[in-house]
């Protein structure tokens, strides 16, 4: 089996700690499966890159990422770098655009049923919640034409979507739905009662599913209505949820409170359909860099589960990815948890426990 090259971009603050724990788990796989070899290449991104090079994404980091099988990212940003002309988050936007990472996948479920009581929503309401937000990541208002206030007292941002952009994200959602038997339902979220871009979105999603995936069902929901359903009846959205860049950013962050901690939720950003389990992708936790958190207190589970997604979708190591997810469930069920989950364990203790569990599962 050829060596798998993983570019590691720790980023800022807790980013270094959480990527270290994910690497620990990946090395545990190497230990019990000698035929599997990972080549980890570390590079700078975000505030750490600004401090060292003056730019949030150095050329060497971008070039290495383009040549890798996958990218594992920690977290970027922090108050130290403020909101000036050069910001850590620009590194993230640039790498997404340069690597054409057009689809962001964010699962929302419970890594373990033992966590149900930690949700801020009643356990009986959230039990069984299981959906994936498929967010369009390189179009829409975040990448549209913008005009800063130049002293005139007026600023603007432009939301633009084209037919091909909506078609390819719809195909990604359809592919994800078809990985299940029976296929999962698709929910498309927009603001078609107000926005022209949303009316195009709704039309193209409908046409693409009807013409290319007649075996699938798609239901359209206005984003504000969906935001209410997500809290009141989250299981109604079970399946695949597809939406635009900004709406996906907001709704996936809202969904992240359901399992009780951002420290549990992974994400994948893909440049193509994972139809061969070898799609190029960037994997990162849904949480930020947590600059106020003391050392060894951050929950590494989201990053470890991001590595599990990487194994399944980019590295053609599906069995090993499932083993990591199973190990996480075992560790959480055993009560080994960080403070955000009402536990007393450190970052490294949780990582150690998952690594040991993975070894036992794969041995």
Curated annotation (Swiss-Prot):
Residues at which NAD(+) binds: 78-89, 288-299
Cofactor details (free text): Binds 1 Mg(2+) or Mn(2+) ion per subunit.
Entry keywords, A to Z: Amino-acid biosynthesis, Branched-chain amino acid biosynthesis, Cytoplasm, Leucine biosynthesis, Magnesium, Manganese, Metal-binding, NAD, Oxidoreductase
EC numbers for this chain: 1.1.1.85
GO (cellular component) term, any one: cytosol
Single annotated GO MF: 3-isopropylmalate dehydrogenase activity
Binding site for Mg(2+): 224, 249, 253
Gene3D superfamilies from the UniProt entry: Isopropylmalate Dehydrogenase
Cofactor: Mg(2+); Mn(2+)
Stored Pfam families: Iso_dh (PF00180)
Pathway assigned to this chain's UniProt record: Amino-acid biosynthesis; L-leucine biosynthesis; L-leucine from 3-methyl-2-oxobutanoate: step 3/4
InterPro entries: IsoCit/isopropylmalate_DH_CS (IPR019818), IsoPropMal-DH-like_dom (IPR024084), Isopropylmalate_DH (IPR004429)
PROSITE patterns, alphabetized: IDH_IMDH
Positions with a binding annotation for substrate: 96, 106, 135, 224
Enzyme class: oxidoreductase
Domain of life: Eukaryota
Site feature Important for catalysis, where: 142, 191
Reactions the enzyme catalyzes: (2R,3S)-3-isopropylmalate + NAD(+) = 4-methyl-2-oxopentanoate + CO2 + NADH
Biological role: Catalyzes the oxidation of 3-carboxy-2-hydroxy-4-methylpentanoate (3-isopropylmalate) to 3-carboxy-4-methyl-2-oxopentanoate. The product decarboxylates to 4-methyl-2 oxopentanoate.
NCBIfam families: leuB
Subunit-level organization: Homodimer.
Family: Belongs to the isocitrate and isopropylmalate dehydrogenases family.
Protein name: 3-isopropylmalate dehydrogenase
